[in-house]
């Protein structure tokens, strides 16, 4: 409860909420980013999602990521998830142009 879920084409790309009075954000990353981020202070494999083999990271405490880094990772998450949509859905959403 109390979480905000952001989707593209019906697919989740980020989840925001609070944990111990700190903002918490969960987002999908590439395999390489997952390996780089998963052990950094303030970051961890996302509960539930990562345990199912998915490459999701949770930013849950300081120091974590800077605001700019967090925005970049959430943008990348949107891109990763939107690429997984059907071409028809991507065209519908204006993510790619019809050929």
Annotate each PLM feature.
Residues 1-99:
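Charge-dense, helix-prone N-terminal extensions
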């Amino acid at each position: 409860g109390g979480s905000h879920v952001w989707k593209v084409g019906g697919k989740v790309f980020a989840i925001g909420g609070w944990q111990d009075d700190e903002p918490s954000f969960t987002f999908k990353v590439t395999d390489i980013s997952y390996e780089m981020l998963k052990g950094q202070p303030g970051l961890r494999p996302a509960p539930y999602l990562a345990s199912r083999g998915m490459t999701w990271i949770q930013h849950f405490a300081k120091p974590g990521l800077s605001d700019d880094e967090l925005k970049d990772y959430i943008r990348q998450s949107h891109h990763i998830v939107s690429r997984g949509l059907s071409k028809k859905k991507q065209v519908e959403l204006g993510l790619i142009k019809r050929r």
